[in-house]
Regions:
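Transmembrane helices of ABC transporter permease
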Residues: 10, 14-27, 38, 59-62, ...
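Pre-NBD coupling/linker segments of ABC/ABC-like ATPases
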Residues: 314-330
């Protein structure tokens, strides 16, 4: 938690002033019962209207000062809490950006969203409440007991007995509920994960008529969450009735003792009123303290979960500068895999096993195989989204681990299977490839990606708005824009991970022809299910269950690789493969 508190360093002044002003407010509140006792004992007893007015004026003054102190404390506590949550959220988001795909896969998207939103908001609310009440409530409880001794020491002994009993109830319930709130948050994660999965795959759910089963699955998870929330709620709900019972018993005893003291002349009736007021103040503050403890318990549970993400160490380390020299015999290499294997975290079996091949600069490399054969896993190793479990991946003659992050990602641009665009304009999305690109660079990339025609047809051209996720564009348009975005950076290696699946054959062929015509020695990796898209590649890698079962040209593989021949024949018979 010390690391979490570090984000308060810019708000030390506010964190000190907020509780101090609340204590100042509480100090004035403690004088109110004494003034009321004077009104009863002196003003009313003597029928002194002037004295009553003066004391009422004092009460009004105390109320105004208390209000000013309360507003000031609220300002400082809100400023500290909001500033803290902003800094924490920024640090959390920044840390998430440093995590590798392995950590992202382990943590899960829905979990990270919960940490960034719900958990941080809960910590903010808990901190705001804590700064305002963590000193005020105990101060009023202790102060009321001390002030009671100034009124009547015998009656004040009731406070000495009552306060420890109340503390046992409050802190006992806090100890019982704190671990349960962690379980509640974990079950909330499950519900949010199911919600996200369902909304993301809503079309698949509709297509397979699985609405009822999805509702049942959600209800099961939601019922578990509800049961745990009710369990925690039932325990927390004991707080108020138990404290009220104890306070009311104490007031009854106080009235009994007070009546005896009045009869023997040990105290006046106004003093009894003051003592009852002090007891009520204790009740109010203990209820606040109970609520504070519940909220702080939730906040601490959430803070622990946020801390767990911040403590997640990135699995990859990138050097600050380029390391090593390129051997002369490897100067023509673009990508070299040497006995590479990959096993994902938590997976029982490797996704890739003993893969070795070399791609020369300027070559086009096709990657083909059945579903789950490891095609995406292979190309994900090139820009170092994952580190190989065994073996070495070399980029341009150097170990991929010797490249700084920016330089490696600048050399190897990847177009993912899912075409992901961001809210903004076509221009702003393309500039992700190179923020300094000119309009000429953008149009050149669009021409190569076969996207220039439809962009020119847009009323605003490059400045045409793009909705979040590219909802206002077709699948083919989104794929071509993501390819153009990668080309804007002018990479030395371009990876198309099944990113032309929404293109027709003519557009796909035109794209491959345009890529081949680019100046320089661009190395292209094309991952595809279509044999027709790969048959003109310089090399084709054939994967089967994580193993490289064939490597060569189209004609060579048809003669030597049964897996490739089976894929080709199955598509050729359907008319999907073309010469």
């Amino acid at each position: 938690m010390n690391k979490m508190l570090g984000y308060l360093k810019d708000y030390k002044r506010e964190s000190v002033l907020a509780p101090l002003f609340k204590m100042l407010e509480a100090t004035f509140d403690l004088f109110v019962p004494l003034v009321m006792a004077d009104i009863v004992n002196i003003g009313i007893a003597a029928h002194d209207f002037h004295y009553i007015l003066v004391r009422c004026g004092i009460l009004l003054l105390l109320a105004m000062i208390g209000l000013a102190c309360s507003l000031t404390a609220q300002y400082f506590s809100a400023k500290a809490a909001v500033g803290y949550s902003t800094a924490l959220r920024h640090a959390l988001f920044e840390h998430i950006q440093t995590l590798s795909f392995t950590e992202m896969d382990t943590l899960g998207t829905s979990t990270l969203i919960t940490r960034m939103t719900s958990d941080v908001n809960q910590v903010q609310s808990g901190l705001n409440l804590f700064l305002r009440l963590f000193l005020r409530s105990p101060f009023v409880v202790i102060g009321a007991m001390v002030m009671a001794f100034t009124v009547n020491s015998r009656a004040a002994l009731i406070f000495v007995v009552t306060i420890p009993l109340l503390s046992v109830v409050v802190f006992g319930i806090m100890a019982a509920t704190r671990p349960l709130y962690k379980t509640v948050q974990n079950r909330l994660d499950r519900v949010l994960g199911l919600t996200r999965e369902n909304l993301t795959g809503v079309r698949v759910v509709r297509a397979f008529d699985k609405e009822k089963s999805e509702v049942e699955r959600f209800e099961n998870a939601n019922d578990l969450l509800t049961k745990m929330q009710l369990h925690v709620g039932h325990i927390s709900a004991l707080m108020n009735p138990l404290t009220y019972v104890l306070i009311n018993i104490a007031i009854v005893v106080l009235l009994y003792v007070g009546s005896i003291e009045i009869n023997v002349g040990g105290m006046a009736s106004g003093d009894v009123i003051a003592l009852v007021n002090y007891m009520n103040q204790i009740l109010v503050e203990l209820v606040k303290l109970a609520n504070l403890i519940v909220q702080v318990s939730k906040a601490l549970a959430c803070a622990g979960r946020v801390q767990a993400v911040l403590d997640t160490t990135p699995g990859m380390a990138f050097p600050e500068k380029l390391l090593g020299e390129v051997p002369a015999e490897k100067s023509g290499d673009a990508v070299r895999f040497e006995h590479v294997s990959l096993t994902y975290a938590g997976a029982g079996a490797p996704s890739l096993s003993d893969i070795s091949f070399t791609a020369k600069r300027g070559q086009t490399i096709g990657v083909i195989g059945g579903t789950g054969s490891g095609k995406s896993s292979l190309v994900n190793l090139i820009p170092r989204f994952y580190d190989a479990t065994e073996g070495t991946v070399e980029i341009m003659g150097r170990d991929a681990r010797n490249y700084p992050r920016e330089e490696l990602r600048g050399k190897a641009a990847m177009v993912m299977q899912k075409a992901q665009l961001f809210g903004g304009t076509i221009r702003s999305n393309l500039l992700w490839g190179n923020k300094n690109a000119t309009d000429a660079d953008l149009w050149a990339a669009l021409e190569t990606a076969q996207a220039a025609e439809f962009v020119k047809a847009k009323p605003l051209g490059l400045d045409e708005p793009v909705e979040q996720g590219g909802r206002n564009l077709s699948g083919g348009q989104k794929q071509r824009l993501t390819i153009a975005r990668a080309l804007v950076g002018k990479p030395q290696i371009l990876i198309l991970d099944d990113s032309a699946s929404a293109l027709d054959y003519a557009t796909d062929a035109a794209l491959r022809k345009a890529l081949a015509a680019l100046p320089g020695s661009l190395t292209v990796f094309i991952v595809s299910q279509r044999a027709a898209s790969l048959q003109h590649a310089d090399q084709i890698l054939v994967l089967d269950d994580g193993h490289l079962v064939g490597i060569g040209t189209h004609d060579q593989l048809r003669q030597t690789c049964p897996v490739y021949e089976e894929i080709y024949e199955s598509q050729f018979k359907k008319g999907d493969a073309q010469k």
